[in-house]
Each structure stands twice: as C-alpha cells, then as structure tokens.
C-alpha cells in the first residue's frame, strides 16, 4: 500500500466519553454486511466493476488490533503479493465480503466484528477473544476466473457451441493468469496457463471472416510460450513457438528476437545471427536486440578460438607432442 494510511492518533482523538477508538471510527463507516458486522470507509476510490464471486484477487493488506500501532498481519512487505482466490484462499469472512464491495485500485479501511473475523475465542496468543479488528486493504487487481474455469471444464464439443467472442475472452483470461504467474517467477505454472489459452484458440475452428480476430490472440500466446520456455532453459521449445509466431507475422520483432535467443543457447550461431539481424531491422534502436547481437559476437569469437585451438592440437607435428612414456 506504499505505507499505512492508518493514523492511531486520529482514531483515539476527542469523541464521546467512554467510547473506544474503533467505536468512534465505526460511526462514520458504511455497513456492508447488513448487521454492522463489516463496516467500510473508502480512502481512495477505485475504477471499473466490483469484484465478482470466485474471482482471484491481488491485494495488499494490513490487520490491526485496537490500541495497537503495528499490524498483527500484513503482506505489504512482499514485492509481489500472492494471487488469492475467493472462497478458497481467504479465511476471514469479513475480508471476503469487503473485497466483493471493492473496485480495482481502491484503498479502503474495514472494521470486522468477531463473528466476521476470529470469533469468540480469537486466535491465541496473537488475537484475543471477541476482538474487533481493523484491516486496510488495497485491491491492486482481480481476475474473474469463474467463467474461465467453467468453460475449460466443458468438452470440446460443448465449447464449439459458444460464439468466438466467448472463446477469445476465456483465452485472454488464461493468458492474463499466465502473465501474473510469470511476474511471480512461477514459470511452470505460467506455461500451463499459456498452453490452456493456446488449446482453446486452436480448438475453436474459426471461419475466414473470424481469422483476423483469432490470429492476434494466438500470436500473443505463442510469444508468451516462447519467452517462458527460455526462462525454463528449454531453448528448443522456445524456438519452436517462436517460429510458429513467425508463421503468423514474419516480421514480428519479438518473435525474431526470441528465436535468436533460443538459437544462441543452442549454439546455432548462424541461425541466431539471421534472426537477430532481422529483429534489428524491424527495431534498430532496441537495446535488448543490440545487446544480444553483441553477446552473440562474443560467444562466436570464443567458439572460433576453441575450434582453432582444437584443430591446432589435432594437426600439430608429432615431435611437438609430449611423450606419454618419456623418461
């Protein structure tokens, strides 16, 4: 959240005598549970639609006990928070209800009564019995996975009955999941999502009129697969998907670059140079492409030097070789 917005001093400021800080705070909060068990105060408005049931959410949060300045629970120290699925990964009922009221980019403060948090027993020794807790939650993003999960569970014949726009939407969701997992360095999991997206797009037989909608979606997934296989140190597979991307767009700089990277790892230096020079022609000022060409040049020089040394040893005069059985 880029630093807590909670101000303990403000919560404990002047108010009705005998009321606790959380009681005073609750008076200006919105009841979203219907029984004042979950109260909400929006700190920063979000945009777009509210979170859908069964969505997977990317959030930053911090939980506080009353009269405590430091959070008892927080994920704000993580560079990339974990993607959490509603109904599975979130244990607090109050947090789940709160998230369903939020929009992308929103930052809000919630009060959860015991029935929506840790119950009458609490969670010793951290959470005392009957504790009302305050959570600050920032909704970074969310992905509606319910539609994708249901669609992927259908047979190929059932999927064929849906219009193309539905298939494109589900494939895009799978790709977005893959991108998120990729950013978390979970490359194997990302690969699975990308392959699901590609299978959906290939399974749907597009008409000639629809092809212009399908090909761009397929191209993006192929580029993702090529990149993720490079990260998995499987250059042959990276080259395979990169070349498939070039069948769709033979001048695509990313595809040419990925193929060049793969060939370099496979020590196919001539092919690597061909791909990278073509990529450079499309994007002359691309630093990654230019640096890869320098890297190729260095590797090739080392390769030539090793070959020259090996040939020198193979064809050196017999007299210049050390005698194995010498005195």
UniProtKB/Swiss-Prot annotation:
<dbReference type="Pfam" id="PF00254">
    <property type="entry name" value="FKBP_C"/>
</dbReference>
<dbReference type="InterPro" id="IPR001179">
    <property type="entry name" value="PPIase_FKBP_dom"/>
</dbReference>
<comment type="similarity">
    <text>Belongs to the FKBP6 family.</text>
</comment>
<dbReference type="GO" id="GO:0031047">
    <property type="term" value="P:regulatory ncRNA-mediated gene silencing"/>
</dbReference>
<keyword id="KW-0744">Spermatogenesis</keyword>
<dbReference type="GO" id="GO:0034587">
    <property type="term" value="P:piRNA processing"/>
</dbReference>
<feature type="repeat" description="TPR 2">
    <location>
        <begin position="219"/>
        <end position="252"/>
    </location>
</feature>
<dbReference type="GO" id="GO:0030154">
    <property type="term" value="P:cell differentiation"/>
</dbReference>
<dbReference type="InterPro" id="IPR042282">
    <property type="entry name" value="FKBP6/shu"/>
</dbReference>
<dbReference type="InterPro" id="IPR011990">
    <property type="entry name" value="TPR-like_helical_dom_sf"/>
</dbReference>
<dbReference type="GO" id="GO:0051321">
    <property type="term" value="P:meiotic cell cycle"/>
</dbReference>
<dbReference type="GO" id="GO:0015630">
    <property type="term" value="C:microtubule cytoskeleton"/>
</dbReference>
<comment type="subunit">
    <text>Interacts with HSP72/HSPA2 and CLTC. Interacts with GAPDH; leading to inhibit GAPDH catalytic activity. Interacts (via TPR repeats) with HSP90.</text>
</comment>
<keyword id="KW-0677">Repeat</keyword>
<keyword id="KW-0802">TPR repeat</keyword>
<dbReference type="InterPro" id="IPR019734">
    <property type="entry name" value="TPR_rpt"/>
</dbReference>
<dbReference type="GO" id="GO:0000795">
    <property type="term" value="C:synaptonemal complex"/>
</dbReference>
<feature type="repeat" description="TPR 3">
    <location>
        <begin position="253"/>
        <end position="286"/>
    </location>
</feature>
<keyword id="KW-0469">Meiosis</keyword>
<dbReference type="GO" id="GO:0005654">
    <property type="term" value="C:nucleoplasm"/>
</dbReference>
<dbReference type="InterPro" id="IPR046357">
    <property type="entry name" value="PPIase_dom_sf"/>
</dbReference>
<comment type="function">
    <text>Co-chaperone required during spermatogenesis to repress transposable elements and prevent their mobilization, which is essential for the germline integrity. Acts via the piRNA metabolic process, which mediates the repression of transposable elements during meiosis by forming complexes composed of piRNAs and Piwi proteins and govern the methylation and subsequent repression of transposons. Acts as a co-chaperone via its interaction with HSP90 and is required for the piRNA amplification process, the secondary piRNA biogenesis.</text>
</comment>
<keyword id="KW-0221">Differentiation</keyword>
<dbReference type="GO" id="GO:0045171">
    <property type="term" value="C:intercellular bridge"/>
</dbReference>
<keyword id="KW-0963">Cytoplasm</keyword>
<dbReference type="GO" id="GO:0005737">
    <property type="term" value="C:cytoplasm"/>
</dbReference>
<protein>
    <recommendedName>
        <fullName>Inactive peptidyl-prolyl cis-trans isomerase FKBP6</fullName>
    </recommendedName>
</protein>
<dbReference type="GO" id="GO:0001650">
    <property type="term" value="C:fibrillar center"/>
</dbReference>
<feature type="domain" description="PPIase FKBP-type">
    <location>
        <begin position="54"/>
        <end position="143"/>
    </location>
</feature>
<feature type="repeat" description="TPR 1">
    <location>
        <begin position="171"/>
        <end position="204"/>
    </location>
</feature>
<keyword id="KW-0943">RNA-mediated gene silencing</keyword>
<dbReference type="GO" id="GO:0045070">
    <property type="term" value="P:positive regulation of viral genome replication"/>
</dbReference>
<dbReference type="GO" id="GO:0007283">
    <property type="term" value="P:spermatogenesis"/>
</dbReference>
<dbReference type="GO" id="GO:0005829">
    <property type="term" value="C:cytosol"/>
</dbReference>
<keyword id="KW-0158">Chromosome</keyword>
<dbReference type="GO" id="GO:0042802">
    <property type="term" value="F:identical protein binding"/>
</dbReference>
<dbReference type="GO" id="GO:0051879">
    <property type="term" value="F:Hsp90 protein binding"/>
</dbReference>
<dbReference type="GO" id="GO:0006457">
    <property type="term" value="P:protein folding"/>
</dbReference>
<dbReference type="GO" id="GO:0141196">
    <property type="term" value="P:transposable element silencing by piRNA-mediated DNA methylation"/>
</dbReference>
<keyword id="KW-0539">Nucleus</keyword>
